């Protein structure tokens, strides 16, 4: 007996997409965002179903992973929100230290007078 060959080979649909990291630059209505990719290309991104169902907030300035089709590189699907770096927290703590130092200087000047 001869076996029928599958004329249409099944391909993994994920192979037709490329994943990039990008920065959300603008929030648009209906879960759409403008995202600047690492190669300075700006594309339109929409939230994937899992992110939408788990109520993950995506705001301007967030770093995201976005899946872009090889056939239409102007649109992509946001599949993951990357965790924030602690740079802002470090800046906040430096600012508070500066305030403490300036208050200490005022206290020493007042005690001298």
Swiss-Prot record:
This protein's GO CC annotations: chloroplast; cytosol
Domain of life per record: Eukaryota
Compartment list: Plastid, Chloroplast
Signal peptide: none
Keywords: Chloroplast, Initiation factor, Plastid, Protein biosynthesis, RNA-binding, rRNA-binding
InterPro entries associated with the record: NA-bd_OB-fold, RNA-binding_domain_S1_IF1, S1_domain, TIF_IF1
Matches recorded under SUPFAM superfamilies: Nucleic acid-binding proteins
Family designation: Belongs to the IF-1 family.
NCBIfam families attached to this UniProt entry: infA
Subunit structure, as described in the record: Component of the 30S ribosomal translation pre-initiation complex which assembles on the 30S ribosome in the order IF-2 and IF-3, IF-1 and N-formylmethionyl-tRNA(fMet); mRNA recruitment can occur at any time during PIC assembly.
Name of the protein in question: Translation initiation factor IF-1, chloroplastic
């Amino acid at each position: 007996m001869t076996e029928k060959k599958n004329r249409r080979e099944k391909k993994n649909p994920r192979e037709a997409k490329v994943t990039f990291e990008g920065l959300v630059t603008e929030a648009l209505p209906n879960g759409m965002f403008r995202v600047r990719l690492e190669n300075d290309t700006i594309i339109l991104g929409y939230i994937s179903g899992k992110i939408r169902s788990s109520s993950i907030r995506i705001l301007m300035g967030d770093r995201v992973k976005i899946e872009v089709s090889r056939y239409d590189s102007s649109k992509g699907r946001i599949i993951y929100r990357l965790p924030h770096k602690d740079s802002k927290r470090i800046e906040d703590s430096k600012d508070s230290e500066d305030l403490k130092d300036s208050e200490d200087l005022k206290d020493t000047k007042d005690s001298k007078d």
